[in-house]
Curated annotation (Swiss-Prot):
Locations listed in the record: Nucleus
Pfam family, one: IBB
Family affiliation: Belongs to the importin alpha family.
GO biological process, one term: protein import into nucleus
Stored Gene3D superfamilies: Importin-alpha, importin-beta-binding domain, Leucine-rich Repeat Variant
Keyword Transport part of the UniProt annotation: yes
Main location: nucleus
Domain of life the protein comes from: Eukaryota
Keywords in alphabetical order: Nucleus, Protein transport, Repeat, Transport
Per-repeat ranges for ARM: 111-153, 154-198, 199-236, 237-281, 282-321, 322-364, 365-405, 406-447
GO MF annotations, alphabetized: nuclear import signal receptor activity
Gene from which this protein is expressed: IMPA3
Name of protein: Importin subunit alpha-3
Length: 531
């Protein structure tokens, strides 16, 4: 395992249907959206381990002397084991100190060899030496590094009974011992949801939260925030009654100016908000939304990304919860993420967030329009990488599902038809369906405008779709393997183009042989050739 393993995330609640109401239209995030977090947090993990765990060498790499020292330490493992099993306290301290250094070497620390030597239960006993804090500290450090290994390594720590002792050490008089216990518990909890729940079942949350006070030094603050984040993460999520007490602390932590603290506090909030609406409400009531929106402008992606993820999770809630975000002026911040030079993953996440806002009511869709976001969303739909286009398509489609006729007319005026048509040939079934839904909603408005006499006898939006080569693409979807896509394509053609097809057929049947031939491109203006 790693100290900061990535969490799995749930799939979209609706796979092939753009909803006609806000509840169905909102989507929890997909697994691949979390890759940005996985990569960044693994980078943070390496930095944390190499700068905090190394007993020798510089942060920029090991020198030949360092490597020589590391090899000497490996050769001395049998002597360390003997010292640890001795009854002399000084020998125990010296051997445990060397063991900690051995487990802290930068490249390939011999964690398995140490575990196989059988010393772990003995080192765990040293954690209880309240009369000898130095030994407690060295033992805790060594065990922390073992817990940063594989799940099997972590399980050895658990089976040796270390977890409840680490929790007791959170009340130690030694700040160094407390900090090392915090780190160790973070490693154990970070291994898996099962390990996380075990740590929480021993009552670790309350003493962890007690570490956060005005006198806490920065290194402890960083480690404790990271451990708190691990207590909150994972699927299935921990019982909310165990993690909810962390919300007031997290509200204070997101006010920090320290990048590491902000990063892990925001990830913790993202985990707590990635759930049902009552959990989202608890996060809102903690008062974190205004600060999270401020952090959407943070210069560091490692802070911006989890802040954006949390805001995105909140707007998967109901309309009132979404409105809480809009009332704090989130839309200009989201527009900034679309318009400026942010990397693909951030633009994708911003589009996902916007798509859940456009799944709201007409007033919320209007707020998106008034913020100037539709223009940028259409630009993304035309020009961005496919993964970003996909989220933008959801944003436009949701807006056509819940928007008024005037709002849909505005989206058409911004050029959304052509890029929606272009995506009808993409290999992603969900995207094809989403675009078909959007085009159908647009055609309904075009038909209403025709019936009102605003566009003569023509559905202008049908003509625009034809001119964008969308009609041909929709026709081709009649042979699609996916039944949902086939049904939707047939429905659209039968609803909006049947009359033209019939008229064209009549023209063909009555045309003089010399003037009109089957398959000819000589179609009267306003007619559509299905040949």
């Amino acid at each position: 395992m790693s100290l900061r393993p990535s969490a799995k995330t749930e799939v979209r609640r609706n796979r092939y249907k753009v909803a006609v109401d806000a509840e169905e239209g909102r989507r929890r995030r997909e697994d691949n959206l979390v890759e940005i977090r996985k990569n960044k947090r693994e980078e943070n993990l390496q930095k944390k381990r190499f700068t905090s765990s190394m007993a020798f060498g510089s942060a920029t790499g090991q020198t030949e002397q360092d490597l020589s020292s590391a090899n000497q330490l490996k050769d001395n493992l049998p002597a360390m084991v003997a010292g640890i099993w001795s009854e002399d306290s000084n020998s125990q301290l010296e051997a445990t100190n060397l063991l900690r250094k051995l487990l802290s070497i930068e490249q390939n620390p011999p964690i398995n060899e140490v575990v196989q030597s059988g010393v772990v239960p003995r080192v765990v006993k040293f954690l209880s030496r309240d009369d000898f804090p130095k030994l407690q500290f060295e033992a805790a450090w060594a065990l922390t590094n073992i817990a940063s290994g594989t799940s099997e390594n972590t399980n050895v720590i658990i089976e040796s009974g270390a977890v409840p002792i680490f929790i007791q050490l959170l009340s130690s008089a030694s700040e160094d011992v407390r900090e090392q216990a915090v780190w160790a518990l973070g490693n154990v909890a970070g291994d898996s949801p099962k390990c996380r729940d075990l740590v929480l079942s021993y009552g670790a949350m309350t003493p962890l939260l007690s570490q956060f006070n005005e006198n806490t030094k920065l290194s402890m603050l960083r480690n404790a925030t990271w451990t708190l984040s691990n207590f909150c993460r994972g699927k299935p999520p921990p019982a909310f009654e165990q993690t909810q007490p962390a919300l007031p602390v997290l509200e204070r932590l997101v006010q920090s100016m320290d990048e590491e603290v902000l990063t892990d506090a925001c990830w913790a909030l993202s985990y707590l908000s990635d759930n049902s609406n009552d959990k989202i409400q608890a996060v809102i009531e903690a008062g974190v939304v205004p600060r999270l929106i401020q952090l959407l402008g943070h210069s560091s992606p490692s802070v911006l990304i989890p802040a954006l993820r949390t805001i995105g999770n909140i707007v998967t809630g109901d309309d009132l919860q979404t409105q809480m975000v809009l009332d704090q002026q989130a839309l200009p911040c989201l527009l900034n993420l679309l318009k400026n030079n942010y990397k693909k993953s951030i633009k994708k996440e911003a589009c996902w967030t916007i798509s859940n806002i456009t799944a709201g009511n007409a007033d919320q869709i209007q707020a998106v329009i008034d913020a100037g976001i539709i223009q940028s969303l259409v630009w993304v739909l035309q020009s961005a990488e496919f993964e970003v286009k996909k989220e933008a398509a959801w944003g436009i489609s949701n807006a056509t599902s819940g928007g008024t006729h005037d709002q849909i007319k505005f989206m058409v005026s911004q050029g959304c038809i052509k890029p929606l048509c272009d995506l009808l040939t993409c290999p992603d079934l969900k995207v094809v369906t989403v675009c078909l839904e959007a085009l159908e909603n647009i055609l309904v408005v075009g038909e209403a405008e025709k019936n009102l006499g605003h566009t003569g006898e023509d559905n202008l939006y049908a003509q625009m779709i034809d001119e964008a080569e969308g009609l041909e693409k929709i026709e081709n979807l009649q042979s699609h393997d996916n039944n949902d896509i086939y049904d939707k394509a047939v429905k659209i053609l039968e609803t909006f183009w049947t009359e033209d097809n019939e008229e064209e057929g009549n023209d063909e049947n009555h045309a003089p042989q010399s003037g009109f031939q089957f398959g000819s491109t000589n179609v009267p203006p306003g007619q559509f050739n299905f040949i």
